[in-house]
Structure formats: structure tokens, C-alpha cells
Amino acid sequence: MAIKLEDKKAIVAEVNEAAKVALSAVVADARGVTVSAMTGLRKEAREAGVYVRVVRNTLLKRAVEGTEFSILNDAFKGPTLIAFSNEHPGAAARLFKEFAKGQDKFEIKAAAFDGNFIAANQIDVLATLPTRDEAIARLMSVIQGATSKLARTLAAIRDQKEATAA
């Protein structure tokens, strides 16, 4: 089906705007995935703050031109589904990884984060990044552990001095 030039320009502009504000991008091949499964993926993507779109490769190359995601151009072969994470860098990777577990034909091609190309076999690195809240919680537990250890040490020193004084 032929797309009019105005429609192509609108698609390129829309994807370019999404790419400019995105933290990371993940590219996948969704051949053989049912419509109902894709609808479910899109719903989950909206809830996770991820922009998902099926775009022709030539339009996608034009859309990411001049952005940090232009390094993904080599991955734009065959049917391409692209997802941009807007709120958390690992959101799109986590979403696609979970979706791929239930879909045999869904294949993650590559990802990009912070100007770096991430191969499909290394997608776990991006998918397992903690969210901001998780990172803060981990930091707080480390700080809390260190302060409680300091308090126990000071109490032990106090008890030792009291024992030697008596």
C-alpha cells in the first residue's frame, strides 16, 4: 500500500520527536506475532511510558538521523518495530524481553542507550537497569547498613571501656 508523501513526512516527524526525547530505543522483528498480542504489547507500552511504532525502514532511518539512535541504522532490516523509552532507560528493553518470552517469533534485533549500540544478546544489561526508585532504595539500604554498623561498633567500644574501667 502506497503512502502519500505528506503522510510519510508526518510519520518521520512523529518518530523524530519521539527519538529526541527518548532515553533509549529497542528494535525488534514482530513477524508472525498475532494482532491481539501486538495490541496487548501496545497497551503495556502505554502503561510503561514507552512509545511503540511499526515503521518502514527508510522512514525510520530518516527519523533517527541526527539523533543518538542513528547507530541503529544497521538493525533496520526486515519488518521493524521500534520502541522508545521516555521515563526509564530500561523500560522498552524490559517490555520487549518479557513479551518475547511468550512469543516464539518475536525477535529483538538491537538497542541503543546513551549513544551506545547494544546487541540483541546483551539486551539484559539494559533490561535489568534499576528504576530511579529502586536505585534510591538500594542506596538508602547501603547507607542504613553502614550507619547501623558504625553504631554497633561505637556501642562495643563503649562497653569495652566500661568493662576495663570496672
UniProtKB/Swiss-Prot annotation:
**Per UniProt, which keywords does this protein have?**
Ribonucleoprotein, Ribosomal protein, RNA-binding, rRNA-binding
Q: From its record, what is one biological process in GO terms?
A: translation
One matching Pfam family is Ribosomal_L10
One GO CC term on file: large ribosomal subunit
Gene Ontology MF term list: large ribosomal subunit rRNA binding; structural constituent of ribosome
Matching entries from PROSITE patterns are given as:
RIBOSOMAL_L10
| Subunit and partners | Part of the ribosomal stalk of the 50S ribosomal subunit. The N-terminus interacts with L11 and the large rRNA to form the base of the stalk. The C-terminus forms an elongated spine to which L12 dimers bind in a sequential fashion forming a multimeric L10(L12)X complex.
- Enumerate the PANTHER family for this protein: 39S RIBOSOMAL PROTEIN L10, MITOCHONDRIAL
Its function, per the record, reads: Forms part of the ribosomal stalk, playing a central role in the interaction of the ribosome with GTP-bound translation factors.
Please report which protein family the annotation says this sequence is part of: Belongs to the universal ribosomal protein uL10 family.
Q: What is this protein called?
A: Large ribosomal subunit protein uL10
Q: Which organism is it from?
A: Pseudomonas putida (strain ATCC 47054 / DSM 6125 / CFBP 8728 / NCIMB 11950 / KT2440)
Lineage here is:
Bacteria, Pseudomonadati, Pseudomonadota, Gammaproteobacteria, Pseudomonadales
